[in-house]
A protein has these predicted regions:
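Short, glycine/small-hydrophobic-rich surface segments
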Residues: 35-78
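Generic detector of bulky aromatic hydrophobic side chains
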Residues: 5, 30, 80-82
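Arginine residue identity/basic-tract feature
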Residues: 4, 29, 41-43, 68, ...
Length: 179
């Protein structure tokens, strides 16, 4: 009976993590629609602007390739390319998202026409969930994400794409949303 109960508990955790990822995606979509309405162009939580990536990926193919091998939370090589949804309070390997300054130290433009209302990704996520944090049901779990930047304008516009995963096993626990 013990192995069967253990399997049942693991199935429950898997279902719970997928439900939590779904909640994150719904809020990301709402955020995108609201920023589209109020800022003139939709962006996702943590994006300074629609055409700026979050994390270390610029295209989806690279993410897919890494997800094939990203099976544990402690994969430093791949994990360091991802951003924590609600921030790293334990100093883990995932990045914390920060606001990109309009100008770099040498006065070069980094974020042209970025919205004044933007904030760090973890703050934007935190506000989307009424100052609550969604926690992974897994001991080593942690919600992480990346945003592939949008591009173009007018009829040639390509919306950003978000990928959210549970660091317990991103290979199995991830979802991708096109907007």
């Amino acid at each position: 009976a013990a192995p069967r109960l253990s399997n049942l508990m693991e199935d429950g955790k898997a279902q719970k993590t997928v439900q939590e990822i779904d909640k994150l995606l719904i809020q990301a979509k709402n955020f995108y629609e609201n920023t589209s309405k109020y800022e003139g162009r939709g962006r996702l939580p943590g994006q300074d602007k629609f055409d700026i990536q979050v994390g270390s990926y610029s295209d989806t193919t690279e993410v897919y390739e890494d997800l094939r091998n990203f099976m544990t939370f402690n994969n430093d090589t791949i994990g360091s390319k991802w951003v924590s949804v609600f921030g790293n309070h334990d100093g883990s390997i995932f990045q914390d998202d920060e606001i990109l300054p309009d100008l770099d130290n040498e006065g070069n433009i980094q974020c042209n026409n970025c919205p004044e209302t933007r904030d760090a990704g973890m703050v934007e996520w935190y506000n989307l969930f009424n100052q609550s944090i969604l926690e992974s049901p897994y001991q080593d779990g942690h919600f992480i994400y990346v945003v592939i930047p949008g591009s173009g304008s007018g009829a040639e516009v390509v919306a950003p794409r978000i990928i959210i995963a549970d660091a317990e096993n991103p290979h199995y626990f991830h979802k991708i949303m096109d907007l």
